[in-house]
Amino acid sequence: MLSILDIIEDTTVDGPGFRTSIYAAGCPNRCPGCHNPESWDINRGRWMSTDEILAKVLADNFADVTFSGGDPMYQPEGFTELARAIKRQSRKKVARTSGAIQDILLRLCYVTHYRPNYCSMSMYW
């Protein structure tokens, strides 16, 4: 189960092309200037199963996926499971933004691209 603030379909602001953006609840980083401070509290989200989220992602044949938030890696097992399920069942590209520690991410994920940024990291599965 993952705590999710929102799922936005067919957005063009969270990565290249059309995306399904999944906004995670919960973030320990408290970055200065955060554009989603309401996402810091994990209890503000709605608990959703990986299968429930996966169905929404796979329903759009054209959009790739962005994990945002909050910090998706505040819930590393769930988002890693979701990323792997998306890759197993589709050709979608999955991007993620996070301020989480790099070596944790590299151990958990099949990373094909890594681009660090101040208090934010983008990673593609």
What are these regions (language model features)?
Residues S3-R30:
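N-terminal pre-triad scaffold of radical SAM enzymes
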Residues L2-L5, F18, N36-A95, G99-L108:
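Conserved Radical SAM active-site core
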Residues D10, D14, D71, M121-M123:
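Acidic side chains
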Residues T97, I104-W125:
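Radical SAM/AdoMet-radical enzyme domain recognition
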Residues R30, N61-F62, H113:
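Short loop/turn motifs at secondary-structure junctions
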